[in-house]
A protein has these predicted regions:
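Short secondary-structure transition/capping segments
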Residues: 33-37, 89-92, 132-133, 163-166, ...
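Pocket-edge positions in alpha/beta enzyme catalytic cores
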Residues: 54, 95-96, 171, 238-239, ...
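Short, hinge-like loop/turn segments at secondary-structure boundaries
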Residues: 39-43, 95-97, 137-139, 168-171, ...
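Alpha/beta catalytic cores of nucleotide-metabolism and tRNA/nucleoside-modifying enzymes
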Residues: 2, 8, 106-109, 113-116, ...
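Hydrophobic faces of well-ordered beta-strands that scaffold small-molecule active sites
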Residues: 22-24, 50-54, 77, 119-123, ...
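Glycine-rich, positively charged N-terminal anion/phosphate-binding segment
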Residues: 4-75
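Active-site beta-loop-alpha junctions enriched in small/polar residues
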Residues: 1-3, 27-29, 55-57, 82-84, ...
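Alpha/beta enzyme core
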Residues: 11-12, 63-93, 101-189
Length: 318
């Protein structure tokens, strides 16, 4: 998610789940080719498995960007065909590509020629006045013919005009049954569902109905304690750290970030929702929001915020 799933966010999320695939922010192919590669592509070994999400519509550019990214060691390269923002549309990529499946096929074929890891596609079920019942299977069939075997389908249409990106995540109705149908019609493909999933319980239910995976975005960001802690149970792993453990596991990373010239709020802005719905959550957010942006702020701010949580928990227990 753009402006959200940066390296700091991914490191934080990895403290809660060892198995879930983490995705970068979308990076455009021209940015990878011409921009500051280390800043855009660097990630830590602790983040694996991690996927790079690319935006673009020029097969040559996407191939070059994939070739560059290959040397960084990502576990997956994902082409975004689902983002509806005006900025993305003006570059002729994102959700607008749902109207051009043959071009998407050309793009992924070029990317696969430069990749030694899976190339995947994230898409919508359709855009504007398209009929998803007809458009989505045709899109999957066309792109799969170019060698892609893994699709993440956001189970909503995108309206390219008249709705903001936020509205496009909320107003178009969800159609989970259509995505489930696609798995039945294309059993050879890996089909993952995105959109409207806010809990591990929902994820388990969808997986039990035959889907290969579930992508959870904003719910995992805003309420990571409920969505990510325990997620490894989906793989049969008994790994569910306590929230306080997660915070303490972040402290060495934060100290290293600060020692390298970084600012505290660059990391802690992703941690605000960790205690969502629990006693002390408000105090946690208040301390981090008020103090992490100050010059010279260090891990003592995080310790102070955590004390607000533990203090409230002890007060209620007493």
């Amino acid at each position: 998610m753009m402006d959200w799933t940066d390296r700091h966010c991914r490191v934080f999320h990895r403290r809660m789940t060892r198995r879930a695939m983490l995705y970068t922010e979308m990076v455009t192919a021209p940015a990878v080719i011409h921009g500051p590669k280390a800043r855009l592509l660097d990630f830590g070994a602790e983040e694996h498995p991690v996927a790079l999400q690319l935006g673009g519509s020029d097969p040559g550019e996407l191939a070059r960007a994939t070739g560059i990214a290959r040397d960084w060691g990502y576990d997956e390269i994902n082409l975004n065909c689902g983002c509806p923002s005006d900025r993305v549309q003006s570059g002729c990529f994102g959700a607008v590509l749902m109207e051009r499946p043959a071009l998407v096929a050309d793009c992924v074929a070029a990317m696969r020629g430069e990749s030694d890891v899976p190339v995947t596609v994230k898409c919508r079920i359709g855009v504007d006045e398209q009929d998803p019942q007809e458009v989505l299977p045709r899109f999957l069939e066309t792109v799969a013919a170019a060698g892609v075997r893994h699709f993440i389908v956001h189970a909503r249409k995108a309206w390219l005009q008249g709705l903001s990106p936020k509205e496009n995540r909320e107003i178009p109705p969800l159609d989970h049954p259509l995505v489930l149908r696609m798995k039945r019609e294309f059993p050879e493909l890996t089909i993952c569902l995105n959109g409207g999933v806010t809990s591990l319980e929902q994820a388990r239910d969808l997986l039990a109905q035959g889907l290969d995976g579930v992508m959870i975005g904003r719910a995992a960001y805003h309420d990571p304690g409920h969505v990510l802690i325990g997620a490894d149970g989906l793989w049969g792993m008994d790994h569910a750290p306590a929230r306080e453990e997660v915070v303490r596991a972040m402290l060495p990373y934060i100290e290293a970030h600060l020692a390298g010239g970084g600012r505290l709020h660059q990391v802690t802005r992703h941690m605000l929702g960790l205690f969502h719905g629990l006693p002390g959550a408000r105090g946690w957010r208040q301390v981090l929001s008020a103090e992490a942006g100050r010059g010279g702020a260090g891990v003592e701010v995080v310790e102070r915020a955590l004390a607000r949580v533990t203090g409230e928990t002890e007060r209620l227990a007493g």
